[in-house]
């Protein structure tokens, strides 16, 4: 089975290449899928979230039964090494997974705002554009927010996501972190901007799928 998954990953690699042209070059050679382990780091925290239709649910609804890639963003972020970078990586991975049928139905993305005062469900829908629903069986990409900073707090604290607010309270900043979560809801990898690259993330997804068979 490991050989089959590795072969599938190698077949997917050329398809991935044309999606990463605008991303910084990979500074290291990622090990092949299945040649390493990703140990449990922590259980993903629980909290209340809202989808783009304003429907409330527990975050755990979006973190089980599939491999989940979760990133915190805010829609007004202009730091090229922050939210825009994460968005480009997620977008490249989405296209690569669409080209890899063996990954269909096994992966989801979650983009969660940490600016609930501005990032309403309606605004998150506009931010998502056409990415909310994948009709080709590739994956589902959820864009979520919260009702208030109070409901957001246990999530950012639980994930260890650093957020800073300017003295005037008008500007936000954060250190980019993206979380790879297994089908049981455990964080298995945390990516910073230096290590967030579609090929390394794709290899980690393949490794988790091999590990959880």
Regions found by a protein language model. Give the residues of each.
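N-terminal targeting signals for export/organelle localization
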Residues: 1-46, 50, 212-213
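Sec/Tat-exported extracytoplasmic proteins
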Residues: 42, 66, 73-76, 81, ...
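Extracytoplasmic
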Residues: 42-44, 62-69, 104-109, 119, ...
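Generic structural signal for well-ordered beta-strand positions
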Residues: 57-58, 188
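Short active-site neighborhood of thiol/selenol oxidoreductases, capturing the structured segment around
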Residues: 58-89, 109-110
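Solvent-exposed, acidic/flexible segments
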Residues: 62, 76-86, 117, 121, ...
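Structural microenvironment flanking redox-active thiols in thiol-disulfide oxidoreductases
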Residues: 85-155
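Thiol-/selenol-based redox modules, centered on thioredoxin-like
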Residues: 151-213
